[in-house]
Amino acid sequence: YFFSLFLVTVFVYKLLTLKKTPSKNLPPSPPRYPIIGNLHQIGPDPQHSLRDLALKYGPLMSLKFGTVPVLVVSSADAAREVLKTHDLIFADRPYSSVANKVFYNGKDMVFARYTEYWRQVKSICVTQLLSNKRVNSFQNVREEEVDLLVQNIENSCSKVINLTELLIEVTGNVVCKVSVGSGDKVDSYKILILEIMEMLGYSRSIEDFFPMFGWVDWLTGLRGKVAKAAKGVDDFLEGVLKEHLTARASNNASADNDFVSILLEIQEADAGSTMDNECIKSLIWDMLGAGTETISTALEWTLAALIKNPDAMLKLQNEVREIGKGKSKISEADLGKMTYLQAVMKESMRLYFTAPLLVPRESRQDVKFMGYDISAGTQVLINVWAIARDPSLWEKPEEFRPERFLNSHIDYKGFNYEYLPFGAGRRGCPGIQFAMAVNELVVANVIHKFNFELPDGERLEDLDMTAVSGITLRKK
């Protein structure tokens, strides 16, 4: 009933507002329906649907998601044009009703619009929170939590273990200690993260596709769910902030180095800065949400891929155990010697992108793009998942072959547009070093200590590598 009412309302609105627009030279487009545009062509795995459409209509496609014009990029050359040549023009973010509610009307770094406020916040994240020096200062936190992970696995040796839960726990503990100073709060925000990541996925609210009809989200109950989740986030973050402020007032904040303390110092040093309490809470939620979800997901895919490919597992075990011979554990100083480990991590992130379409961008102005007319306000989806499986760029792209990265110049830092696990340009992920420091240390120590088998006599071909799509690509 609600959906029928919605369609009738949109149809009437279209008739009343119909007007001629100058013809533009747009990229090729699949046939679209009135009102909904191309939404019916996007299945539960958007990266698959868009890749299949691109094979027919080309690496640049013009789509319509409801009233929203969308440019879909599915080639390395086109990705370079967006992320490098026209990076500033495509530096904005589209409006997201969910993100707007959760992140205090756009005060975070990931989803905020491209403004002077965003530039200041991004600078703080890059120079104060995620600099090489700062990431290195958290080495003890990483090593302590990885030691606990290894101990937990040892305590369950010869038993069936749930690696997913253990990886979420170790990642959550690292990110939580670094962000708020304590790993005890992981359980408080873990469920919230999963709920919000699901709501931020590509099956978004009606309001995002039809801004005039946001009331439909109220009828379907989505708005209530978002409000409840946003309140849970704020209650959690407000508690964290009050604890830190109380400790600082009583001079008990002894050499605190967590992100909340750093941001409070910035706030105190410049009372007129953009760093108000809502900004602090938004940035901390960015770190907690993006850090925990993406790192644990990448780790799960990597270990699953190694278990499913025993030849690669054996090569990595030989390398790690040779370098770690006579040691009880692998230290961060050892990681730089492990070339096959680095190749494994790169190959895992090529096949199993945690963000297969990156976070959508939006054009800030009209632009002539690769011969086509792209209007201001066009949403841009870069199908990095499809680019990384392009057979013209990668030999046997569907196979897990870490060897392809040995003696290769290709890296994950955003300069090779055939391989963009962290994005690139102004909107590229600033947490690359933080994420890889955790990823490599966890995998190296787990492989150093343990051999893995599937439970109950399962065969390798039975290992389910199905993905669950959302804003991140989690293993089923």
Curated annotation (Swiss-Prot):
UniProt note: pH dependence: Optimum pH is 7.5.
Industrial or biotech use: Psoralen possesses photocarcinogen properties. It intercalates in double-stranded DNA and cross-links pyrimidine bases under UV-A irradiation. Psoralen is widely used in combination with UV-A radiation to treat a variety of skin disorders like psoriasis or eczema.
Keyword hit for Isomerase: no
GO cellular component: endoplasmic reticulum; membrane
Catalytically driven reaction(s): (7S)-marmesin + reduced [NADPH--hemoprotein reductase] + O2 = psoralen + acetone + oxidized [NADPH--hemoprotein reductase] + 2 H2O + H(+)
Bilayer-spanning residue ranges: 1-18
Assigned EC number: 1.14.14.141
Keywords in alphabetical order: Endoplasmic reticulum, Heme, Iron, Membrane, Metal-binding, Microsome, Monooxygenase, Oxidoreductase, Transmembrane, Transmembrane helix
Protein location: Microsome membrane
MF terms (GO), sorted A to Z: heme binding; iron ion binding; psoralen synthase (NADPH) activity
Pfam families recorded: p450 (PF00067)
Main location: membrane
UniProt xrefs under PROSITE patterns: CYTOCHROME_P450
Enzyme category, top tier: oxidoreductase
Signal peptide: none
Highest taxon in the source lineage: Eukaryota
Membrane topology qualifier: Single-pass membrane protein
Similarity remark: Belongs to the cytochrome P450 family.
Function recorded in the entry: Involved in linear furanocumarin (psoralen) biosynthesis. Converts marmesin to psoralen and, with much lower affinity, 5-hydroxymarmesin to bergaptol.
This protein's name: Psoralen synthase
Organism, as annotated: Apium graveolens
Gene that this polypeptide is encoded by: CYP71AJ2
